[in-house]
Amino acid sequence: MIGAVLAGGKSRRFGEDKLLFEINGKPLVLHTIERLEGCSSIKKVIIVASPQNREAMEEFGYEVVVDDLTIGPISGVYSALSLGDAFVVGGDMPSLIPEFIDYIIKQFNNSGKIACVPRWSNGYLEPLHAAYSKNFRDILEERIEKGLYKLGDAISSAKNVCYIKIEDLPLGWRESFFNVNKKEDLHRIMQ
């Protein structure tokens, strides 16, 4: 399975391109990529970039897929799935737990479903920590054409989705969902 790192965000709350911000001598996005590379189920890591940050992302030596639509995570996932089934994460997720990702991919493979997404008991989804079939791209395309850009709604509208109940998993795995939004968030990973 492909590991797809979404790197097309605008970093408004952070104040600069957070994915290039160095933490312990390395850009944030590389911390995320290294965690993905630690997953036995991930065969290849790609970066999904916006046209604006394509060149910066190409500097890291990974295959870069350009999200020309740039309408949010939905078009990032859509772009990633052009290469096949993918486990998709945000580029600002430096605390990914490889065992958790491998667990989700195993559930995805065993389920035969179009996607496998962690879900909290209140119904909230973690769509940027999920496995998607390349066939999910058709659903995304249809929604994008209709101007419906919320990834969570696209997942909820699909009939063939495997949901993983987060509360039933090891407590430590929840750290995998942590993402950096503001500079104040960095203290959690700079220790």
Swiss-Prot record:
Binding-site residues, GTP: 6-8, 18, 67, 92
Keyword annotations: Cytoplasm, GTP-binding, Magnesium, Metal-binding, Molybdenum cofactor biosynthesis, Nucleotide-binding, Transferase
Cellular localization per UniProt: Cytoplasm
Keyword Nucleotide-binding: yes
Single GO BP term: Mo-molybdopterin cofactor biosynthetic process
Domain of life from the UniProt record: Archaea
Family annotation (CDD domains): MobA (cd02503)
Enzyme Commission code: 2.7.7.77
Residues involved in Mg(2+) binding: 92
Transmembrane recorded as keyword: no
GO CC field: cytoplasm
Matching Gene3D superfamilies: Spore Coat Polysaccharide Biosynthesis Protein SpsA, Chain A
One Gene Ontology molecular-function label: molybdenum cofactor guanylyltransferase activity
Annotated PANTHER family: MOLYBDENUM COFACTOR GUANYLYLTRANSFERASE (PTHR19136:SF81)
General function of this protein: Transfers a GMP moiety from GTP to Mo-molybdopterin (Mo-MPT) cofactor (Moco or molybdenum cofactor) to form Mo-molybdopterin guanine dinucleotide (Mo-MGD) cofactor.
Classification via HAMAP family: MobA
Protein name per the record: Probable molybdenum cofactor guanylyltransferase
Protein species of origin: Pyrococcus abyssi (strain GE5 / Orsay)
